[in-house]
């Protein structure tokens, strides 16, 4: 039989594979974070019909004569170039800008994906559409310990941030320098005890006969337990500041008066606690560019709950596709190197966006034409070889 017949068959098979790869790329043009593939060809064994001959003093050397035996698929590579961004506005949609992969766990197997379309399930775990659980590091008392063993990223449903006792409060704003002597301003601030119970601390500001001066004391407190506020002056007169402001304590709360001013006309003094809060329950959450899941509590407090892990590979092209836009590590990809979003080589996260497919339709349709024409050309090899064989069989007539 003619060798060209089998060469044509190998060409059909190889170009059919190219058509399959190209068709799959086009089919996934709108698949989240899909990475296009490409088929590479190489020739097969060649039959040596004449060996090379070395040069002699009386004759020149001769090159080997070889007849190729067709083509085969050398490999199918994956293009891991960054896809474009698609804004979704959904807080659990995450896009990686960089080379990292999300780490997921499904059925006891660790998988890796670029597709950041996530949801929280009924158990509060962050999962992919097919149920793989996103992995990362949990937080203890709001502090994430990176670098250890990873676990499920989850929202602790019904979580409570404990109450914290108030220890300090700050009064700021303006005490009017043109207020009448003896006039008073009463201002309050709410503080918390160890159990989160709220109570009110009240201060009375009294205008003194000292130029632009005031005294401050606890409302209803002893007259001796007051602080004198003396207006500060320079060569041009009053500066609007109080000199040598000394804080004091009221019922165990340190009062800070350093932000008070003394300009005319305005009475804007107000108090605020520097710390302390009542107990709060988890209301909502945010996801940051560094992968930190932050819980927002009913008492206004924010606390880190966990941080999403990202993985990189020495050879991402060695990853094996596992379906559902996921990959698994192989011997040739190397082991996963874990880190936090924002670290070198891993990339940062964007919440409310997804990475689009990196399929280039213009390139894929060109590849489709090339594969089709290659298939047709190899089919002609077979039909032509068949005609030659037909002529051979007709020689007997």
Q: What is each of the regions a protein language model found here?
A:
Residues 388-397:
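Structured functional modules or segments
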Residues 2, 28, 35-367, 374:
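Small/polar low-complexity and glycine-rich loop motifs
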Residues 1-43:
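N-terminal intrinsically disordered, low-complexity, charge/repeat-rich segments that act as generic
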Residues 24, 373-376, 380:
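Core alpha-helical elements of the protein kinase catalytic domain
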Residues 12, 16-19, 368, 375, ...:
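Hydrophobic a/d positions of heptad-repeat alpha-helices that form coiled-coil
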Residues 13-16, 358, 396:
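Residues at alpha-helix boundaries and short interhelical turns
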């Amino acid at each position: 039989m003619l060798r060209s017949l089998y060469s044509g068959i190998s060409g059909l098979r190889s170009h059919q594979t190219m058509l399959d790869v190209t068709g799959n790329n086009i089919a996934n043009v709108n698949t989240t974070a899909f990475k296009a593939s490409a088929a590479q060809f190489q020739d097969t064994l060649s039959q040596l019909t004449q060996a090379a001959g070395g040069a002699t003093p009386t004759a020149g050397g001769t090159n080997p004569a070889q007849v190729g035996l067709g083509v085969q698929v050398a490999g199918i590579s994956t293009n891991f170039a960054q896809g474009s961004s698609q804004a979704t506005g959904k807080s659990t949609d995450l896009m990686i800008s960089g080379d990292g992969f999300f780490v997921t766990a499904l059925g006891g197997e660790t998988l890796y994906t670029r597709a950041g379309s996530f949801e929280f399930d009924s158990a509060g775990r962050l999962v992919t559409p097919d149920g793989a659980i996103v992995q990362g590091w949990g937080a203890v008392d709001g502090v994430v310990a990176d670098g250890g063993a990873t676990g499920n990223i989850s929202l602790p449903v019904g979580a409570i941030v404990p109450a914290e006792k108030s220890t300090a409060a700050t009064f700021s704003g303006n005490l009017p320098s043109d207020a009448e002597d003896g006039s008073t301003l009463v201002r309050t601030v709410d503080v918390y005890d160890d159990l989160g119970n709220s109570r009110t601390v009240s201060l009375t500001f009294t205008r003194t006969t000292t130029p632009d001066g005031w005294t401050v004391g606890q409302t209803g407190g002893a007259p001796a337990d007051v602080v004198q506020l003396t207006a500060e002056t320079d060569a041009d007169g009053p500066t609007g500041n109080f000199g040598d402001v000394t804080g004091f304590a009221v019922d165990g709360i340190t009062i800070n008066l350093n932000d008070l001013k003394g300009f005319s006309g305005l009475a804007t003094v107000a108090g605020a606690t520097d710390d302390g809060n009542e107990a709060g329950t988890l209301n909502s959450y945010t996801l940051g560019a560094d992968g930190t899941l932050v819980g927002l509590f009913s008492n206004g407090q924010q606390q880190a709950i966990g941080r999403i892990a990202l993985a990189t590979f020495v050879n991402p092209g060695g990853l094996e596709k596992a379906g559902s836009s996921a990959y698994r590590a192989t011997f040739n990809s190397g082991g996963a190197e874990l880190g936090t979003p924002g670290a070198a080589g891993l990339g940062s996260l964007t919440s409310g966006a997804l990475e689009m497919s990196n399929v280039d339709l213009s390139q894929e349709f060109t590849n489709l034409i090339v594969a089709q024409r290659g298939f047709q050309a190899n089919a002609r090899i077979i039909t032509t070889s068949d005609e030659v064989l037909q002529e051979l069989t007709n020689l007997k007539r």
